[in-house]
């Protein structure tokens, strides 16, 4: 999507971990959209995909780097 980047968060182990990603994005104040999860929304571990604004991509990467160390995520803005 124009003006948006894709955030990929791999190795999400449970719903609490997924909520920590959403909470981090909320704290940044970015307008994000959960696009999909693989394999499915209710199965774990999973990889979650979010659209985030291009102009927030660097802040999102920094925030997710901290969470990645804590939760073992494999997160990157594509």
Regions found by a protein language model. Give the residues of each.
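Short glycine-/aliphatic-rich beta-strand segments at the starts of folded cytosolic domains
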Residues: 1-12, 46-48
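Short, surface-exposed ligand-recognition loops at beta-strand->loop->(often short) alpha-helix junctions
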Residues: 8-17, 53-55
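Short, flexible N-terminal segments of the mature chain
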Residues: 17-39
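Short amphipathic alpha-helices in soluble, non-transmembrane regions
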Residues: 20-26, 59-69
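Conserved short beta-strand edge segments in small beta-sheet-based binding/regulatory domains
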Residues: 31-36, 68-78
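Short, intrinsically disordered low-complexity segments
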Residues: 33-66
């Amino acid at each position: 999507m124009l003006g948006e980047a894709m955030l990929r968060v791999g190795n999400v182990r449970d719903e609490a971990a997924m909520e920590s990603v959403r909470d981090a994005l909320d704290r940044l104040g970015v307008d994000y959209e959960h696009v999909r999860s693989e394999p499915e929304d209710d199965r774990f571990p999973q990889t979650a995909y979010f659209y985030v604004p291009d102009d927030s991509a660097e802040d999102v990467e920094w925030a997710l780097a901290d969470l990645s160390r804590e939760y073992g995520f494999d997160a990157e803005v594509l």
